[in-house]
From Swiss-Prot:
This is Fibroblast growth factor receptor 2. Residues 585-862 form the Protein kinase domain. Belongs to the protein kinase superfamily. Tyr protein kinase family. Fibroblast growth factor receptor subfamily. The active site is at 728 (proton acceptor). Expressed in brain, stem cells and the mesenchymal cells. One of its GO terms (cellular component) is receptor complex. CDD domains: Ig (cd00096), PTKc (cd00192). The gene is FGFR2. PANTHER family: FIBROBLAST GROWTH FACTOR RECEPTOR HOMOLOG 1-RELATED (PTHR24416:SF550), TYROSINE-PROTEIN KINASE RECEPTOR (PTHR24416). Keywords: ATP-binding, Disulfide bond, Glycoprotein, Immunoglobulin domain, Kinase, Membrane, Nucleotide-binding, Phosphoprotein, Receptor, Repeat, Signal, Transferase, Transmembrane, Transmembrane helix, Tyrosine-protein kinase. ATP binds at residues 591-599, 619. It comes from Dugesia japonica.
Amino acid sequence: MLNKFIVIVTMLAMWNYAQDCNFELSKNETVQFTSFLPLILNCASISKFDTDLCETINDERPYNWYFQNKKIGNETKGKIKLVSSSQQMIIFNGSASDEGNYMCETINNNKEFISKTFDARMIEPSMTQMELLLNSFPNDHQEEINGRIYWLPEMILNHIRDVVIINQGAESDLHSFYYVSGSDSQISTFDVQWYFHYQPKSEDKTIIDHNIKTFYSSCNDLDLLPRKVNGSCYSSRLYLYNVEIKDQGFYSVEATLRMKNGSSHGLNFTYELKINIANILDPDKTNSILSTPQISFNLNSRVCINDRFDWICKVTPVVSYYVTIYKNNSNPNNITVLAESEVLQMNIDGNSGQGFYLKSSTVNYSVNSVQREHAGVYACRIINFKDYSSDHQNRHEPEVLMRLTVKDCVGNSYFTIIWYSISVGIIILVVISFLIIRLYNKYSNGYIVKTVIVQHPNKLYVPHDTCFPLLMPDITIKTIHKHINSSEDSLLQQKHFTNNSNIPFSQKISKYFRKSFIFSYRHVDVSSSNLDSPLGVISNTETNKLTSNSLTVETQRPQLILQNDANTKYILPSNIGWIFSRDSLIIGSKIGEGAFGIVYSALVKSFSENSASVEVAIKTLHTSFGDQDVINLIQELEMMKIIGRHRHIISLYGACIDNGHPYMVIELAKHGNLRDFLRAQRSQSKVGEIQNSGGLVTRLTVTDFLRFSIEIAEGMEYLSSRKIIHRDLAARNVLVDQYVEMKIADFGLTRIVENYYRKTTDGRLPIKWMAPECLLDRVYTVKSDVWSYGIVLWEIFTMGQTPYPTIQSDGMHQALRNGIRNEKPALASDEMYRLMLTIWNDDPLERHTFSEIIDKLTHIQLSNGGSSPKRDYLEISSNQCYSTTIV
């Protein structure tokens, strides 16, 4: 008998051992991940057994992973990484294709198969994660720039939420993770500094010099890095103990890397910390309740059956109150809240049924379809967490009551339908009336007539400084009539262009329009040959005609009018010969759009049977253009006329007006702007490839970058020799033609200067391309363009990156005063970077001229095995003084 008892006890012990010590996996999970970040799946055991009672077993179990019921094999190497004896799977650079069902499979101690499933769902990154991704660790080693700081994946994964929330009195830490590119022999120092400030981006900040630890670790020991690296990994942790309300605010961490070659790079991030002052789990650490809290609750209300009703209870001030809304089910006429009352809403951190965790001072309860059983008395009650106990329902607490009455409104539905129909009818009538008024104003009385006045200091101005000084015209717009109809418009035309036919035409224009529009009186047959001739050249015969006192107005001369979609007409003086008629243009597809307007590709049809059509670009305004847009257009046209022609400056061919809309016809650059061109080569292949007009594939090299730089410098040298400053030189404003030659464009901000130009008006400016004197004093010189050219050099050798990526535009001036400059591009030699730093000298007089820059770039090019560039662009000699007649 005793033996049987021992056997039974032994069997029970073994069964308990098997139950208590058997290996189990945790429950199935739903895992959320963010695009571009690792997806981490953990198949480890739940570790429920006691190691003092159970035999310790080395976990050498096999783990197999499946995706969508298909086993994951070696074909995913590089994309997927298995760590911790294959118990954990990391999928790098997560994307939508990684969504789905995953399963890990292993065996327990009884050699039975067990498994765990994961439902992986991709979510949008938080605003903080999107900010961090801009400087995240590059998955491709070729995108890694030496001497830069990047955020490690751990940094981004830890910021699913934009705000850090810590319970009052708790302990926590703020943690930042860095990857520093470059070997230890190249790095001089790496420093991390923490600050506290009450407002974001505030200059009033306090240095934190305690409870901080910065660690160095081997990058190749980190599981979340998808590749082997040569740099260093750091983490910095700020410890927070017993946090209080005064600790709430913004914590910024700034990392600075200084290289032995003199370059530096910085990376910063700001944490927003909020303190939960109502902590139900530890009521002793909450603030004391104010003696007279204010409760705002619904007033007595009547609602129809099936309508929606919202109960809203708000408590001020926001302190540690437990807020509830009650319904009294025992007696609707008794406004006292009883113990058996039904609690409609209590939340703790989003989990219903336990209480209210005070993240907000407001509690809401809604019923989408009210029924009769919802009628009754409701109460909003607050309880201080500090005094919270199980018998709180039996104590008198601050509360506000309201009565809800529910009624059947079906009998009133007829009047509701009538009222609804009348309201809709009134709205439709108002809309129709508004449209009729708009159409009436547009086609009857809606025109506002303005005249464009273009005044030149001299009657003749020429595109060469050896003939006459180059001066831009003064362009103004004057309203001459408001809300005239079609018949009045015809009378206006007759008044301006047919009366007093014996008066010389030049005097008429002076009388009615002062000086006028940009285009000269000449006729040009459009063909491929004359597109290469300078704009503004007219014959002596035509000049004599225009200056003759006997010139009269032709009775059939058409009036030139611009008209926008706001019913405003801009009257321009009529011209005998526009360079292009609308019929000579075949407009193609849209190739670009910006704040100025829209750019289309087009063909110019030849007037000659033997000449081919010419591909051009057409720049036009948006249909909603206004006075300033017209002025900017005329200024750019005037400036391009004065500039003339140069191999590395985009050419103006002419313009025309089509149904009141202006078209500026310019040279077509098939490869678009330089910035996008470089970025496209960077993203399409590891080594950029371009295709020239001959059909040959060419790889972009440093020699090409030097050629681009020299060509842009030659164009800027030409502008500076003519005392012209561009003011908006950037890679986005340099175009690339079919032969991959550089063409400077966008002269909307360009000005002519003797020594300097001072900007007196506000407007959008290219802050990160501007010199310090432009930012501080609004003074522009040729040396300001030299500074901008240095930024263009940096853009070229970084293949289109944005300058100063870690500095906001409003902080640029202070950064430049502190001596901060763009770091050395990975593709630039030391000699090239020294040239950039010289160009970015604070003193404009110490910066190189464009001629000196060309010489230095040519020397660098020859040192790299290139050939000296041929400067065979069109030169205008001093005896070629082309006059342009302005009426």
